[in-house]
Regions:
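Metal-dependent enolase-superfamily TIM-barrel catalytic cores that perform enediolate-based chemistry
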Residues: 124-236
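Hydrophobic faces of well-ordered beta-strands that scaffold small-molecule active sites
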Residues: 46, 131-137, 160-162, 188-192, ...
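Metal- or metallocofactor-binding catalytic centers and their adjacent structured scaffolds
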Residues: 5, 37-114
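Glycine-rich, aromatic-flanked loop segments that form ligand/cofactor-binding clefts
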Residues: 105-137
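N-terminal basic, low-complexity leaders that serve as flexible interaction/assembly modules and, when applicable
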Residues: 1-64, 68, 362, 366-369
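Conserved, mostly hydrophobic/aromatic
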Residues: 3, 34, 41, 70, ...
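Shared catalytic-loop signature of beta/alpha-barrel
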Residues: 207, 213, 224-241, 246-340
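Flexible C-terminal active-site loop/helix
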Residues: 4-15, 26, 31, 297-369
Length: 369
């Protein structure tokens, strides 16, 4: 089997409502879609969701990199040779994880379709019976966040994740308001997205909310301050999760060496796809660290990829693959029942991609063959 063409689409996905985090506010999200065709006629789809604040890539840089620097080198390669393909990509471009993730995911979609297996069977088989997801609330006034959280609990959610990080004093009010609104039996996750920046600010906030029984605090300090994150972990009783500070093997080694986090948030867009994510899971298992599969608010394509990985690995205890719930348009359909994402058992990713929608939402596309 050989890759005979790769088509790259630069698309924009409309959100149901603005999504506000510590570093930006989004009204639509850029997504790079890859359509990979083989000489056997099998077609696989992949997705890259770049973010300058997280992956160091922009929408158009990712599109151009895939179109000019990566895709042409992969023509004639076998999608099953996934390690070789990653080596080719790494030799061609440094870092660029979401660009590489788009190719990686398309390869796994092809492999699953070629073997007649869902991707999770290529990763070890189904180890979890279901995938539960939290209700995610972006940065808003405390009373609005509390109201959304209460409504989510009434709708059947058992875990609430809130975004904070734009103002420490208001963040304390947000955390307290949401905890009061949802009671003590619902899990509460707090994500600062680097917004508290340093140890001093982080500890000032955490000392005021330690009684709020948070499941964890995620990435409170700047991404490259792993030493600072380790200090936070030493000074608080709240479990600490690293997100933006963890991309690949280099950061993982330092996190383990410095005992900088209790938990890790793996995102396919940060590490380069399913194949490198499996390596991070193995390292986390060696270090005894629990894993979450997070999301860059991706479409059904990359969300499905994360779901297949999550359901196949015992060390992955948490999932935040909620992107499809946040878009008014999508390229495919994933099924959610209350707080559960239903597993896709069809071959490949299990997503029936609507190519007409991909083309309609594209602002630019190119075919490499």
């Amino acid at each position: 089997m050989k890759i005979v063409s790769i088509e790259v689409f630069a698309t924009e996905l409309p959100l149901l409502r603005p999504f506000i985090v510590a570093y930006d506010a989004f009204h639509e999200l850029p997504s790079i879609i890859v359509k990979m065709t083989t000489d056997t006629g099998i077609v696989g789809y992949g997705e890259g969701m770049p973010d300058p604040h997280v992956t160091g890539e922009t929408f158009y840089s990712t599109y151009e990199m895939l179109s000019r620097d990566v895709a042409p080198l992969l023509l004639g390669e076998n999608p099953f040779d996934i390690e070789k393909i990653h080596k080719i990509m790494s030799a061609a471009v440094y870092h660029a994880p979401s660009a590489k993730a788009a190719i990686d995911i398309a390869c796994f979609d092809v492999m699953g379709k070629a073997t007649g297996q869902p991707v999770y069977n290529l990763l070890g088989g189904k180890v979890h019976s279901s995938l539960s997801v939290p209700y995610v609330i972006s940065i808003l006034p405390p009373e609005e966040m509390a109201s959304q959280a209460a409504d989510a609990v009434k709708a059947g959610y058992t875990s609430i994740k809130i975004k904070v990080g734009d103002d420490p004093a208001t963040d304390v009010k947000r955390i307290r308001a949401v905890r009061e609104a949802i009671g003590t039996t619902i899990q509460l996750r707090v994500d600062a997205n680097q917004g508290w920046r340093n140890v001093a600010t982080t500890m000032r906030v955490l000392k005021q909310v330690e009684d709020c029984e948070m499941e964890w605090i995620e990435q409170p300090v700047l991404a490259d301050d792993i030493i600072g994150l380790a200090e936070v972990r030493q000074k608080t009783t709240i479990p600490v999760m690293i997100d933006e500070g963890l991309h690949g093997d280099k950061e993982m080694r330092e996190v383990i060496m410095r005992q900088a986090a209790d938990l890790i948030n793996i995102k396919l867009m940060k590490c380069g796809g399913i194949y490198p994510a499996c390596k991070l899971v193995a390292q986390a298992e060696m270090a005894g660290m629990g894993c979450q599969i997070g999301s860059m608010v991706e479409s059904s394509i990359a969300t499905a990829a994360g779901a297949h990985l999550s359901i196949a690995k015992s060390m992955i205890f948490s999932n935040e693959m909620v992107g499809p719930l946040m878009f008014s348009r999508d390229f495919g359909v994933l099924t959610y029942e209350k707080n559960e994402l239903l597993v896709m058992d069809a071959p490949g990713l299990g997503v029936d991609v609507n190519e007409a929608t991909v083309r309609e939402l594209s602002v630019q596309s190119t075919l490499i063959q």
